[in-house]
């Protein structure tokens, strides 16, 4: 008993410290000036490859930026027509965006032979960069959000979008004051830890971190459920276990 008491006190102290540290991190996550993000009212463009990317991978970022009062736009580079379901998937995308708070007028879907929904086709990053820049300039965008070089799942279309924003930045073509955030790809184990990945996400380097509340997580689930044509059994498991349904870590280019 004499030995147990100090150990219990130590455990309690560690627990309190952990709670305070997580709370402090949460405070930093919800303050745009501390996170290095543009302030409220800023126009943010999410750039995705396929309908359902916005819900499968970026829901924490979308809802986190909405929490910070960003005006959100979505540019989807394909209609997701790999299985000839393009028309269905466009409607599902608009429904998902509505759940996530992005109005139809702010959703742009590209249907161009240069950008087929096909993991075996490498999109031309220069062509993608030109299209992306047009939308950035036309909408007065201050923040672009897209995939990192790993593309989360390694899909070649995701990776091409990262190459496109890197091309724009390297050539100095982005408008003054426009920054780029990329979504961190993580290893397979972390990818399916859901909220258990939070300690790793807090400890490891990143420029921005968004973690959904329980209510927001339910909203993300509803958005993903709009993509009925894609809800095969393994995607239902993904919805339950993937950290990307609850946590997004991002870095500035």
UniProtKB/Swiss-Prot annotation:
Keywords: Endoplasmic reticulum, GPI-anchor biosynthesis, Hydrolase, Lipid metabolism, Membrane, Transmembrane, Transmembrane helix
Membrane topology, from the record: Single-pass type I membrane protein
Catalytic activity: a 6-(N-acetyl-alpha-D-glucosaminyl)-1-(1,2-diacyl-sn-glycero-3-phospho)-1D-myo-inositol + H2O = a 6-(alpha-D-glucosaminyl)-1-(1,2-diacyl-sn-glycero-3-phospho)-1D-myo-inositol + acetate
Any Pfam family the entry gives: PIG-L
Regions that span the bilayer: 3-23
EC number, UniProt record: 3.5.1.89
Location of the protein in the cell: Endoplasmic reticulum membrane
Pathway: Glycolipid biosynthesis; glycosylphosphatidylinositol-anchor biosynthesis
Secretion signal, residue range per the UniProt entry: none
Gene3D superfamilies recorded: LmbE-like
Biological process annotations from GO: GPI anchor biosynthetic process
GO cellular component: endoplasmic reticulum; endoplasmic reticulum membrane
Coiled coil: none
Entry keyword Transmembrane: yes
Residues in the Cytoplasmic compartment per record: 24-253
Alphabetical list of InterPro entries matching this protein: GlcNAc_PI_deacetylase-related, LmbE-like_dom_sf
UniProt keyword tRNA-binding, yes or no: no
Free-text note on domains in this protein's UniProt record: Retained in the ER by two retention signals, one located in cytoplasmic domain, and a second signal in transmembrane domain that is functional in the presence of membrane proximal residues of the cytoplasmic tail.
Family as reported in the entry's similarity comment: Belongs to the PIGL family.
Function comment: Catalyzes the second step of glycosylphosphatidylinositol (GPI) biosynthesis, which is the de-N-acetylation of N-acetylglucosaminyl-phosphatidylinositol.
Protein name: N-acetylglucosaminyl-phosphatidylinositol de-N-acetylase
Gene expressing this chain: PIGL
